[in-house]
């Protein structure tokens, strides 16, 4: 799996203005839009089916740095597999443009997901994969696609898990852009 960034005008969903696969270049473009994008490395090998404590321990230094920088209060690990009985419902839940009252911070331990951000007339499609951290600032319009056969393990950081409720914008813009196949 790879990571990539595609940038569009929100008025021209079929025309890619910028397409990047170099992670340093992706980080620069995203930073200019106020989005944190980093790569993390585990400080120890993970087992084949790691539990939450093992995953957090493997990335503890980066987690601690982010907590110190941003004041996050809660850390957990979420995973999704293709045979999850509610995968379709979970996918549908975040496919429409929405906002959260706090940052949405995700680090991909395994797998991938497509975050699409709608900022100042631009749409940023960020395909995140293993080793990628993305932090979507509070109140940024965005949507997320885990794909029809999702497979990922991600670390989540929160200020307040109750603040991570999706507030939908009512826009249909997400339907005009790419989804994971």
From Swiss-Prot:
Database matches in CDD domains: cupin_ARD
BP-aspect Gene Ontology terms: L-methionine salvage from methylthioadenosine; L-methionine salvage from S-adenosylmethionine
Residues involved in Ni(2+) binding: 98, 100, 104, 142
Cofactor binding summary note: Binds 1 Fe(2+) cation per monomer.
EC identifiers of the protein: 1.13.11.54, 1.13.11.53
Marked site: May play a role in metal incorporation in vivo: 97
The protein's required cofactors: Fe(2+); Ni(2+)
Feature type site, description May play a role in transmitting local conformational changes: 103
Catalyzed reactions per annotation: 1,2-dihydroxy-5-(methylsulfanyl)pent-1-en-3-one + O2 = 3-(methylsulfanyl)propanoate + CO + formate + 2 H(+); 1,2-dihydroxy-5-(methylsulfanyl)pent-1-en-3-one + O2 = 4-methylsulfanyl-2-oxobutanoate + formate + 2 H(+)
GO molecular function, one term: acireductone dioxygenase [iron(II)-requiring] activity
Pathway(s) of this molecule: Amino-acid biosynthesis; L-methionine biosynthesis via salvage pathway; L-methionine from S-methyl-5-thio-alpha-D-ribose 1-phosphate: step 5/6
Site (Important to generate the dianion): 106
InterPro entries: ARD, ARD_bac, RmlC-like_jellyroll, RmlC_Cupin_sf
Subunit structure: Monomer.
Function summary: Catalyzes 2 different reactions between oxygen and the acireductone 1,2-dihydroxy-3-keto-5-methylthiopentene (DHK-MTPene) depending upon the metal bound in the active site. Fe-containing acireductone dioxygenase (Fe-ARD) produces formate and 2-keto-4-methylthiobutyrate (KMTB), the alpha-ketoacid precursor of methionine in the methionine recycle pathway. Ni-containing acireductone dioxygenase (Ni-ARD) produces methylthiopropionate, carbon monoxide and formate, and does not lie on the methionine recycle pathway.
HAMAP family from the UniProt entry: Salvage_MtnD
Name of this protein: Acireductone dioxygenase
Gene name for this UniProt entry: mtnD
């Amino acid at each position: 799996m790879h990571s990539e960034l595609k940038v569009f005008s929100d008025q021209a969903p079929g025309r890619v203005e910028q397409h990047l696969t170099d992670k340093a270049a992706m980080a620069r473009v995203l930073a200019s839009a106020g989005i944190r994008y980093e790569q993390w490395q585990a400080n120890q090998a993970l087992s084949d089916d790691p539990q939450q404590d093992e995953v957090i321990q493997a990335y503890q230094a980066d987690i601690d740095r982010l907590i110190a920088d941003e004041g996050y209060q809660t850390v957990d690990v979420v995973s999704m597999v293709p045979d999850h009985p509610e995968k379709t419902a979970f996918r549908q839940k975040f496919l429409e443009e929405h906002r959260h009252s706090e940052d949405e911070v995700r680090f991909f331990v395994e797998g991938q997901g497509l975050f699409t951000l709608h900022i100042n007339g631009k749409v940023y499609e960020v395909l995140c994969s293993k080793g990628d951290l993305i932090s979507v600032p509070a109140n940024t319009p965005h949507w997320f696609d885990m794909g029809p056969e999702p497979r990922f393990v991600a670390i989540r950081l929160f200020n307040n898990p109750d603040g991570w409720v999706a507030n939908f914008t009512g826009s249909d813009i997400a339907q005009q852009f790419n989804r994971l196949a």
